[in-house]
């Protein structure tokens, strides 16, 4: 019976520094997949609060705010689905973020792929709480979970949220996704599943997009932010992205594209860190007065309500949370045609999909929407309907439930 199933969710949250730009950009220090993994930690901690098995959630350094949205809600859904739910924590702030109806379990912080104290702790938790499934969402979690479950009947489910290259010649991958003891892999996007299908049977993979609850933007709607000096009738484009030392985020192309736009009504608001060279590029072109680089802001999402467009100009990316946040605010989206990001937007219905690494394409797409405010508004409305229909927590948790039950029944 489902009630008798115990599930352990191992999540290693990246530490979040002061002044992160938005929910999208938490945990960026880890590279390409770090944004996605930190965001996915929210999804699974929230899912744990609603699925209902014994959940061990959030092994590693967590952040109260990061744990709080997707994580707490999903945890609630797991509980409602009749799983006995446990959530692990490493800091007091994380402990406080755990819902009252879920038992917290303290675990040591770890980042290495082999950490003996952590492995011992996981084995003890498995025995004490009769865990049947471990859901590990990054490489360190997965590796330590595989070591900890040796000699047990516990099934390990992994997660992949990035298209970073996998090399069979690199033996460390056999401590993770290429290990035959991984019972199933959850993939954030269809593109990721297709990439992994070169190494893993499609039957052992499930696409489970990260959910988003529009209610998470209530505070942003209640306390919206604006940029001083931008006229009320301006066409405002927002970009939420930490780009310092990350040229693949496409900020340079976005700035170059802005300099190609002659419409004086178009203003760009960038929130997040950036390289000095990009700032200088913004100041040295014809659109300098219309490019507003606000830096790191904890209230970054508060700049979305009431704006016209949210743009993701990345050359490569995962599945940006900023696009979900924009859709929840009924803001039209422009996204480059790259794996992951393009799955969020329906071209010509909720926004525009453009070729990557092209200032000209950026300028043309912004210009098209600036000249057609009715279409821009319609895109925003359609995006809102898409987020509340296709990216629900209920669908996300149901997919987890199905996979957990599937691996247990084998």
Where are each of the predicted segments found?
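Conserved acidic donor-binding segment of nucleotide-sugar-dependent glycosyltransferases
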Residues: 347-348, 352-359, 368-374
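Short His-centered aromatic/hydrophobic patch
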Residues: 136-142, 160
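Nucleotide-activated donor-binding/catalytic signature segment of Leloir-type glycosyltransferases, i.e.
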Residues: 280-297
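A short, well-ordered alpha-helix in the C-terminal region of glycosyltransferases
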Residues: 361, 368, 375-390, 396-405
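Aromatic "clamp/platform" in nucleotide-sugar-dependent glycosyltransferases that forms part
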Residues: 315
């Amino acid at each position: 019976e489902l009630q008798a199933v115990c599930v352990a969710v191992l999540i290693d949250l990246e530490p979040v520094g002061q002044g992160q730009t938005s929910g999208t950009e938490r945990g960026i220090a880890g590279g390409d997949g770090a944004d996605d993994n930190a965001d996915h930690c929210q999804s699974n901690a929230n899912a744990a609060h609603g699925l209902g098995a014994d959940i061990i959630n959030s092994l590693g350094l967590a952040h109260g705010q990061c744990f709080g949205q997707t994580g707490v809600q999903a945890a609630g859904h797991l509980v409602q689905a009749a799983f006995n739910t446990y959530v692990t924590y490493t800091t007091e702030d994380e402990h406080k973020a755990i819902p009252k109806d879920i038992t917290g379990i303290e675990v040591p912080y770890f980042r290495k792929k082999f950490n003996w104290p952590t492995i011992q702790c996981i084995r003890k938790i498995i025995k004490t709480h009769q865990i049947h499934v471990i859901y590990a969402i990054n490489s360190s979690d997965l590796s330590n979970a595989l070591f900890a479950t040796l000699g047990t009947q516990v099934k390990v489910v992994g997660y992949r949220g990035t298209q970073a290259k996998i090399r069979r010649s690199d033996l460390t991958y056999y401590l993770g996704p290429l290990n035959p003891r991984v019972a199933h892999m959850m993939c954030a996007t269809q593109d990721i599943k297709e990439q992994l299908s070169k190494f893993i049977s499609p039957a052992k993979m499930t696409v489970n997009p990260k959910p988003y609850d529009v209610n998470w933007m209530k505070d942003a709607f209640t306390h919206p932010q604006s940029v001083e000096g931008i006229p009320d009738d301006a066409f405002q484009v927002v970009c939420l992205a930490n780009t310092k030392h990350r040229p693949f985020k496409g900020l340079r192309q976005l700035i170059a594209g802005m300099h190609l736009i002659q419409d004086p009504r178009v203003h760009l608001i960038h929130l997040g860190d950036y390289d000095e060279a990009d700032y200088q590029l913004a100041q040295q072109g014809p659109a300098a007065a219309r490019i507003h680089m606000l830096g790191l802001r904890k209230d970054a999402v508060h700049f979305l309500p009431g704006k016209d467009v949210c743009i993701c100009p990345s050359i490569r990316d995962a599945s940006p949370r900023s696009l979900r946040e924009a859709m929840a605010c009924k803001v039209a989206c422009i996204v480059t045609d790259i794996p992951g990001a393009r799955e969020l937007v329906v071209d010509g219905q909720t926004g525009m999909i453009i070729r990557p690494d092209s200032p000209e394409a950026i300028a043309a797409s912004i210009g098209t929407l600036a000249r057609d405010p009715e279409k821009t508004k319609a895109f925003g409305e359609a995006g809102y309907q898409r987020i509340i229909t296709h990216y629900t927590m209920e669908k996300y948790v149901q997919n987890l439930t199905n996979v957990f039950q599937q691996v247990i029944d084998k």
